[in-house]
Amino acid sequence: MQVSIWMLVITVLAAVAAYFAGSRVNKKDSGLIVKQSEELAAKMIDDARREAETITKEADLKARAEIIEAKAGHDREITEKKKDLQILEKRLQQKEENLDKKFGLIEQKELDMLKKEQSFVAREQNLAAKSEELSRASDVQQAKLEEISGMSASEAKKELMTSMEDEAKHDAAKRIKAIEEEARETADKKAKEIISLAVQRYAGEYVAEKTVSVVPLPSDEMKGRIIGREGRNIRALEAATGIDLIIDDTPEAVILSGFNPVRREVARMSLEKLIGDGRIHPGRIEEVVAKATEEVDLGIKEAGERAAFDLGVHGIHPEIIKLIGRLKYRTSYTQNIYQHSLEVAFICGIMAAELGINVKQAKRAGLLHDLGKAVDHEVEGSHAVIGADLARKYGESAKIVHAIMAHHEDEKPNSVLAVLVQAADALSGARPGARREMMETYVKRLDDLERIATSFGGVTNSFAIQAGREIRVMVSSDHVTDEQSLIMARDIAKKIEAEMTYPGQIKVNVIRETRAVEYAR
């Protein structure tokens, strides 16, 4: 196809060349030119033919090379596929061999199982025969035993069960006692560690109890101005504050007496302002008392907020904050209740951290545990019950309310938090120096404790120990049984509660001792 095209092109070129040549030269030279053109055309045709042959050969060689290469690639692909097929065949062959082995093992196991089953059946039959034989022998032996012992089988079984039961109870009692002693020793040791750590890490201040306040005067002449004409000033001051003013021979001093420390503080501040101002008359007294009351209320609120801030306790109702501040002016057995509440809160927090419970909740319960003492002279009832009612009223959680209620056994403590508050309260109130009483009052209280204990029948002796926080009552084992000793302890506790006034709680410990004496001769 390519050769034909080339020849056609050459022929056309030759014809064109001849045409132009014929039109430009003389006719004479036309023959020569034609001849030359023909020769040139023939030469070009030969060159074209040779070139076409060359091209054809090259194309043929190229086509053959491509065919050879394609065939080689196809052969390689076939070879790879054959290899893959051989690998698959080997795998299949291995799987078949494995399956054959497994089938052989299964068949062997089935045969073994069949043999074992046959063996078990034979053994079962043998055991059944032996069991029947033993049963007959047992019946014979039982009949002989019943004949010899004079007891039936059920009676003998009952006797054996009773004996075993008594022995088991005895062993169990010994084991329980050992476990209880071990647990008690461990618990006591851990409790002492926690309590000692809590006490060591906190040392609070305390303020001695006072029912009077002393206001210094610049001179004794001021006493007359305080009394006023016909005593009108002193009457106005007492009426406005509810506090008694005692003006006696004490030089340059006026004594304010009253059981309510808040009102006493208002009276003290008012009197100091009046003395400093110099204007003392009923109208001015009422004005100054009103202003002093506002200042005391503000100081109470600030004291409550400071306590909550120092402990890191937040979200307390404003009314409870005020009640906490009022505890600053409340004391119990010479111990300031505000400082006591802070101390209990810190001790609760330390012990809670040691036990791994909520520290903030423990501090909150400790701070609020004596909340009722802020108003116990205004509301009837135990300060623990009053405090729990106030906490419940102002949105404290049930756990906090229960801890307040239970810290003096008005409610049985049923949570770790309640027990912590109870322990911290006892630690704060009972530590040396926290509370003070007159020596006569102290001795009288101990005498009263022992007198109440010895008033019961069967008591041989009694001892008031632990600074009056425990009474040990020794009773005669001939006149008082174990059950009666429990009742006696409860009766003594009730009589102490009815006849005595005391801080914290008193442990009544009734001890009954039985001695067995025998002589070896």
Curated annotation (Swiss-Prot):
Pfam families: HD, KH_1, RNase_Y_N. Residues 211-271 form the KH domain. Coiled coil: none annotated. It is a single-pass membrane protein. It comes from the Bacteria. It is found in: Cell membrane. GO terms for cellular component: plasma membrane. SUPFAM superfamilies: Eukaryotic type KH-domain (KH-domain type I), HD-domain/PDEase-like. Its main location: membrane. One of its GO terms (molecular function) is RNA endonuclease activity. Gene3D superfamilies: Hypothetical protein af1432. Its EC number is 3.1.-.-. GO terms for biological process: mRNA catabolic process. Keywords: Cell membrane, Endonuclease, Hydrolase, Membrane, Nuclease, RNA-binding, Transmembrane, Transmembrane helix. The chain crosses the membrane at residues 3-23. It is an enzyme of class 3 (hydrolase). Belongs to the RNase Y family. Endoribonuclease that initiates mRNA decay. This is Ribonuclease Y. It comes from Pelobacter propionicus (strain DSM 2379 / NBRC 103807 / OttBd1). The gene is rny.
